């Protein structure tokens, strides 16, 4: 058997085989060629024959840089094995999802990019020739699920086929191997190294030697084989495990291959097809048309046949279309008559009566009510409804009367005394007759009244059922007695008696039947409703509540039609499907079920008839929430091919929407215009116009477009609806009461990123705290119309963000406050009580004036309390200091002091005063000074705000300004800062922020001078006759450096620290 070397496949582009620099690799010492094992990725190994005599260049190391080599033409006279069509067909497609030893696709020359990048040794990444039998070398059908991954590989296949088909020299010529497309034989490492097929160039001795040396491969070192194959240890073990007959000879390829096979195997589009067989595309048109394209193959020259079918004709026999055709809607046309509507309702009622379902009788009653309303032009009278209710109740039920069970006079459980026959009277000794006549009963009642025994007379009358005498006599007595007689009378009636329901309702109570009707032991619910509707007197609200209670009870029992009948009698308005608490949405359909079962065609038609009956008495009395269901009904008409009727519905809905004016919903308006735009060509008036006027729309559609444009323009011009939409997008609802209440005084201007979240000013953030002691309530109209810098500057989040204190940036005001929050923080620092500073007390003041935080600051947590936990004596000293200091100020400061007094009154009234700690519960465990100040800082009363890098320059500047005039009542601001933070001067951003809050009242107006003069120096407090406003807990932390604006600390050391 002749030995065949395995056929080589083209290597990956850009990774050509380089000559080897190792003289011992692939050769024997005697100069003869020895096979070098190569590894296939499924474990099959093959031998590459190399000849150092015929190789133009030595083979390069695998790790050397790969360079593109020029292709060498085959020598004249060399015979090359023809490439079958299977090579071209399956070379670019993965035809197996999972590996199978011996059946792997061995012709796969170009791997995916990921596979090419996995192996760095391109010269060793080749597959061996497949060991397939002759009957297996048949082109398989292409799998539609396995497509090529790289476009270049697909392009390579196409170019290769083109060369095979159009080569004038056949398949074995030299020109075929010198073409632009890569040849599997030429691009293989064997051809690049000058190696040819055995039997052509190698003598028989070499072939025999090679065959003799084959068993020696098994004795080769595993490490050498791994290094030569480029596989890792685990990959090599796997390849050895799944190796399938590496020494088996390859049978010769089929010589009967022809280019025709290549045409058959390669026929197919370059891109994946959506369908693999001819199919039928179908589309629905807006005019009730069905567009049908017959199956055809355009590649075979077959023309596609397009057919147009009418949906009205196709669905002519369907029940849904028949139900829609039988209804003469919309009911606002001039050609609609009441007789047609009444006939339609009577037919529906008759159909309901024939059915034996649970609610068939109630459904027929609802249709009969619509007939009555249509006959009476929408007006309802209680007696007419009662007559309708009692039509099916011809045989009145015999309600069993209850015997009296208790003596109502002494309220005991004794039965009524019954005189037996033949028993002598103990007083007179006479034997009374067995049955007393009515005359005798009345005579005895009169005799008791002769002697003034009223209660005995009432008892006798009630015992003998003289309820008229008893009720009249009790009505002339006290109210308790009358109520007692009434209760005795009603107790003799059956609980399910309609008289019981009427008497309970007349007594001012909701009857018991309202909560118990619908049950089997209570009987029919109709007589109870009839007696209520026919005898409406007194409080109409009580009667309405009783009827609604009956409807709710029936709805709870599943009697939807009966419940809706009661709701119509109580004049309950129609609601919405999404609001489950609404009683009524569509007549005869419960909105607690899914929408497809809820919005039935019959329910929509029934509700439209009720709307029509209302418009008979009151024109244009549309049901606003029902218009969307009419639009749904119009869409169903268009789907079933009834396009003209659907367009009439669009016109009717448009008339209802135009009558509502601005209250119409914009979404309904947009969807109505869309549907009308599709159906407008079915209007005969549009079709009858001239060809140049075909684009003109109906007048009602043009009016709808104008109304939509006005609504959109109004929404853009009005900022309040825009804010409501933004707040809804930011996670809140448009019914946000807080946002609506303060929308008039916010004065926002939308920034580019404004729609991402809802931002509020610091003043509004204070209002969001859950504490009952709300500090500084916002007064409506206190802001200018355009808003200040606090409103137009950096936005503040609606949610809470932990504060971050950056070291080396000054006080925490500069770190945490934005443009508009600087002045607000200064006012809080000026008017807060002891211990309410924003930074830790353990701070030092360097000589350069910059405050350095000595230890890391913990984020300030938001607290509902609005006061600090300082001592009572410290608070009193603060107030005394403020009063003494204010008396020694100049007249210019007198007005400022008046503002401060107003602010204090406002502060006390708002729960943020000096003694507000008195109304709160102090903490049991005293915390350190740093923790106390961190938890009681003014920022903790507000929602914490995140700091930004540019906010540090907008706060208080600690550099004093010598030319600034002093201001009074600012010692409270400098007291809690260790003496160093009391020099308040605002930067350029602070001046703008001060202008933004110029209209504030109360404590906000106190710092107006401070806000308007950003370079002001806070003066030291007056030391004569006044107590320094310092917290004694700060004495150990006071720095040694002195300053002109710092007060004398000697007086502060005189007072020991007060417990909290």
Swiss-Prot record:
Biased composition (Gly residues): 991-1001
UniProt region (Central conserved domain (CCD)), positions on chain: 271-713
Modified residues (Phosphothreonine): 858
UniProt KW keywords: Endoplasmic reticulum, ER-Golgi transport, Golgi apparatus, Membrane, Peroxisome biogenesis, Phosphoprotein, Protein transport, Transport
Disulphides: none
Family the UniProt entry places it in: Belongs to the SEC16 family.
The name this protein goes by in its record: Protein transport protein Sec16B
């Amino acid at each position: 058997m002749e030995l065949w070397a395995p056929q080589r496949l083209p290597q990956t582009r850009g990774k050509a085989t380089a000559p080897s620099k190792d003289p011992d690799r692939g050769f024997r010492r005697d100069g003869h060629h020895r096979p070098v094992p190569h590894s296939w990725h499924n474990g099959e190994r093959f031998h590459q024959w190399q000849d150092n005599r015929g190789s133009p260049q030595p083979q390069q190391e695998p790790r050397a840089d790969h360079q593109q080599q020029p292709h060498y033409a085959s020598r004249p006279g060399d015979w090359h094995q023809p490439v079958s069509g299977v090579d071209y067909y399956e070379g670019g497609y993965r035809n197996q999802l999972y590996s199978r030893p011996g059946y792997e696709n061995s012709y796969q020359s170009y791997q995916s990019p990921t596979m090419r990048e996995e192996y760095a040794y391109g010269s060793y990444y080749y597959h061996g020739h497949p060991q397939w039998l002759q009957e297996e070398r048949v082109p398989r059908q292409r799998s539609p699920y396995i497509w090529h991954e790289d476009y270049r590989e697909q392009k390579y296949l196409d170019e290769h086929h083109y060369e095979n088909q159009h080569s004038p020299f056949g398949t074995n010529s030299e020109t075929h191997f010198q073409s632009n497309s890569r040849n599997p034989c030429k691009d293989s490492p064997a051809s690049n190294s000058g190696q040819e097929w055995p039997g052509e160039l190698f003598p028989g001795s070499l072939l025999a030697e090679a065959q003799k040396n084959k068993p020696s491969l098994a004795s080769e070192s595993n490490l050498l084989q791994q290094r030569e194959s480029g596989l890792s240890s685990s990959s090599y073990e796997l390849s050895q495990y799944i190796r399938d007959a590496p020494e088996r000879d390859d049978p010769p390829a089929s010589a009967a291959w022809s280019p025709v096979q290549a045409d058959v195997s390669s026929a197919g589009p370059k891109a994946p097809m959506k369908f693999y067989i001819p199919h039928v595309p179908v589309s629905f048109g807006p005019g009730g048309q069905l567009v049908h394209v017959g199956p055809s193959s355009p590649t075979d020259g077959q023309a596609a046949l397009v057919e147009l079918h009418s949906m009205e004709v196709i669905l002519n026999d369907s029940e849904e279309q028949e139900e829609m055709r039988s209804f003469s809607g919309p009911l606002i046309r001039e050609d609609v008559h009441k007789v047609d509507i009444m006939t339609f309702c009577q037919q529906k009622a008759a159909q309901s009566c024939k059915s034996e379902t649970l609610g068939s009788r109630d459904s027929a009653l609802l249709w009969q009510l619509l007939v009555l309303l249509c006959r009476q032009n929408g007006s309802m009278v209680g007696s007419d409804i009662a007559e309708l209710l009692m039509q099916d109740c011809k045989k009145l039920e015999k309600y069993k009367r209850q015997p009296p069970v208790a003596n109502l006079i002494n309220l005991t459980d004794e039965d009524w005394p019954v005189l037996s026959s033949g028993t002598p009277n103990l007083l007179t000794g006479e034997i009374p007759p067995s049955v007393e006549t009515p005359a005798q009963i009345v005579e005895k009642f009169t005799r008791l009244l002769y002697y003034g025994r009223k209660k005995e007379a009432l008892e006798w009358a009630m015992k003998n059922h003289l309820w008229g005498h008893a009720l009249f006599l009790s009505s002339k007595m006290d109210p308790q007695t009358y109520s007692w007689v009434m209760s005795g009378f009603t107790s003799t009636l059956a609980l399910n008696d309609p008289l019981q329901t009427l008497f309970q309702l007349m007594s001012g109570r909701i009857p018991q039947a309202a909560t118990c009707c619908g049950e089997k032991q209570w009987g029919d619910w109709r007589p109870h409703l009839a007696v209520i509707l026919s005898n409406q007197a007194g409080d109409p609200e009580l009667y309405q509540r009783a009827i609604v209670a009956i409807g709710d009870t029936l709805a709870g029992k599943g009697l939807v039609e009966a419940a809706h009948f009661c709701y119509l009698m109580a004049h309950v308005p129609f609601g919405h499907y999404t609001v489950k608490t609404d009683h009524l949405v569509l007549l005869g359909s419960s909105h607690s079920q899914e929408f497809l079962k809820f919005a039935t065609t019959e329910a929509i038609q029934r509700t439209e008839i009720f709307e029509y009956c209302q418009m008979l008495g009151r024109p244009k009395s549309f049901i606003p929430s029902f218009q969307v269901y009419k639009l749904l009904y119009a869409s169903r008409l268009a789907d079933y091919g009834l396009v003209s009727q659907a367009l009439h519905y669009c016109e009717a809905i448009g008339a209802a929407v135009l009558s509502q004016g601005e209250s119409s919903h914009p979404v309904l308006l947009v969807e109505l215009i869309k549907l009308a735009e599709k159906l407008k060509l079915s209007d005969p008036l549009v079709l009858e116009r001239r060809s140049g006027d075909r684009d003109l729309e109906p007048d009602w559609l043009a009016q709808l477009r104008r109304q939509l444009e006005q609504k959109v323009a109004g929404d853009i011009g009005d900022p309040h609806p825009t804010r409501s939409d933004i707040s809804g997008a930011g996670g809140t609802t448009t019914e946000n009461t807080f946002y609506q209440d303060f929308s008039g005084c916010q004065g926002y201007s939308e920034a580019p990123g404004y729609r991402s979240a809802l931002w509020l000013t610091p003043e509004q953030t204070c209002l969001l705290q859950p504490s009952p002691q709300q500090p500084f309530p916002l007064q409506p109209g206190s802001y200018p119309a355009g808003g200040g810098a606090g409103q137009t500057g950096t936005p503040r989040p609606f949610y809470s963000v932990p504060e971050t204190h950056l070291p080396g940036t000054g006080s925490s005001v500069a770190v945490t406050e934005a443009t508009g929050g600087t002045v607000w923080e200064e006012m809080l620092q000026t008017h807060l009580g002891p211990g309410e500073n924003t930074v830790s007390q353990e701070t030092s003041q360097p000589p350069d004036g910059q405050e350095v935080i000595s230890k890391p600051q913990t984020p300030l947590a938001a607290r509902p309390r609005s006061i600090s936990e300082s001592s009572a004596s410290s608070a009193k000293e603060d107030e005394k200091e403020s009063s003494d200091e204010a008396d020694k100020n100049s007249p210019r400061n007198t007005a400022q002091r008046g503002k401060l007094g107003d602010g204090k009154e406002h502060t006390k009234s708002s729960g943020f005063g000096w003694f507000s700690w008195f109304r709160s519960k102090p903490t049991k465990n005293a915390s350190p000074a740093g923790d106390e100040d961190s938890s009681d800082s003014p920022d903790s009363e507000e929602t914490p705000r995140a700091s930004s890098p540019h906010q540090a320059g907008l706060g208080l500047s600690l550099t004093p300004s010598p030319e600034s005039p002093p201001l009074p009542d600012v010692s409270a601001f400098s007291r809690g800062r260790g003496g160093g933070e009391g020099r308040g001067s605002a930067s350029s951003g602070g001046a703008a922020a001060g202008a933004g809050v110029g209209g504030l009242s109360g404590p906000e107006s106190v710092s107006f001078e401070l806000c308007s003069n950003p370079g002001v120096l806070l003066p030291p407090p007056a030391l004569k006759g006044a107590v320094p406003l310092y917290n004694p807990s700060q004495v150990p932390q006071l720095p040694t450096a002195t300053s002109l604006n710092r007060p004398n600390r000697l007086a502060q050391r005189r007072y020991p620290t007060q417990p909290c």
